[in-house]
């Protein structure tokens, strides 16, 4: 089980990414459309002025139940251990155990 501080830190990062997403995208778009280096530098400085945790790459994929970061399934948002337990308990609709 991950520490609660790590889970809360990741939630805070997710909130910041949602808050600054449109501003960050518009700055990147304007920076790519400009031709002069000076204008690009201005947009680059504006991007750097945004909070560091507002970048999407800072979010870590962690299981929302256990907080485990390794063996994470993106489609379900849980780790493989939790996935297995929930599948055996029939808590994930549409999943069947294969046998041949």
From Swiss-Prot:
Function text: Binds 16S rRNA, required for the assembly of 30S particles.
GO CC, sorted alphabetically, is: chloroplast; small ribosomal subunit
InterPro entries membership = Ribosomal_uS14, Ribosomal_uS14_bac/plastid
What family is reported? Answer: Belongs to the universal ribosomal protein uS14 family.
What subunit structure does UniProt give? Answer: Part of the 30S ribosomal subunit.
Note the HAMAP family from the entry: Ribosomal_uS14_1 (MF_00537)
Q: Where in the cell is it found?
A: Plastid, Chloroplast
Q: Which gene encodes it?
A: rps14
Which organism is this entry from? Chara vulgaris (Common stonewort)
Record keywords: Chloroplast, Plastid, Ribonucleoprotein, Ribosomal protein, RNA-binding, rRNA-binding
Recall the GO molecular function terms of this protein's record: rRNA binding; structural constituent of ribosome
Name its GO BP terms in alphabetical order.
translation
Its name, as the record gives it, is Small ribosomal subunit protein uS14c
Q: Which Pfam families match?
A: Ribosomal_S14
């Amino acid at each position: 089980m991950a520490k609660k501080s790590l889970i809360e830190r990741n939630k805070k990062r997710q909130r910041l990414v949602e808050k600054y997403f449109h501003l960050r995208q518009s700055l990147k778009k304007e920076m790519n459309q400009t031709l002069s280096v000076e204008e690009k530098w201005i947009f680059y400085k504006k991007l750097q002025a945004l909070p560091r945790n507002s970048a999407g790459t800072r979010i870590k994929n962690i299981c929302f139940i256990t907080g485990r970061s390794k063996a994470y399934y993106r489609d379900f948002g849980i780790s493989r251990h939790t996935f297995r337990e929930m599948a055996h308990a029939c808590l994930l609709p549409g999943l069947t155990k294969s046998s041949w």
